[in-house]
Amino acid sequence: MLMIPWQRAVGIGYQQEVIARLKNHTLGYSGSQINVTLDSSTDTFPLNQSLYLDFSHDTNIVSVLTAFGLRQFSQLLLPTEYPGQHNFTVTHVTPFGARLDIEIIRTPKPLAADRGGYLDGKETKYVHFVLNQRTLPLGWSMPECDAARVDGWCELEAFLRAQDKMPELARFDYACFGEYSPPEYGTVLDGVPP
């Protein structure tokens, strides 16, 4: 999934919009394909909503997942052999009518990674990615998130820290407009050109 050198750049605009909403601010500059004329005004980019609905073509989901840094789909699939068990099957990730839900969950106290109960502490917010009704474990891709969580959730603050570096990693201008030779198959594993 991450083998196309502009994959991360294609989805980074949506990633920036989601993060701006989570941080409750508009976007005056993005360094990507965002129309900041719309995203810089709360009239056209509303904030503090309990529900946002964004629509796109289902094939954009792969770029969006790459832009968010989800690496569990980055296994190199060789054209010469059957891969066996693997995490990326196009028909599962982007079927017709594919859906990506990003949920923010608030708990009265931190929730144990094994979901065995609450821990001591204050109210905690978590982010939960659901792709076609299946949880995407965020800890598999982001060291800031707890890989041991059985629910795949990530504490919201840890998730936001992980996401802060994603626009820079996308290298939007270079990926989309840079002059580079097409990389050999298997050399791009993170959605950006070498």
Give each language-model segment a name.
Residues M1-P194:
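Non-catalytic terminal regions with compositionally biased, polar/charged low complexity
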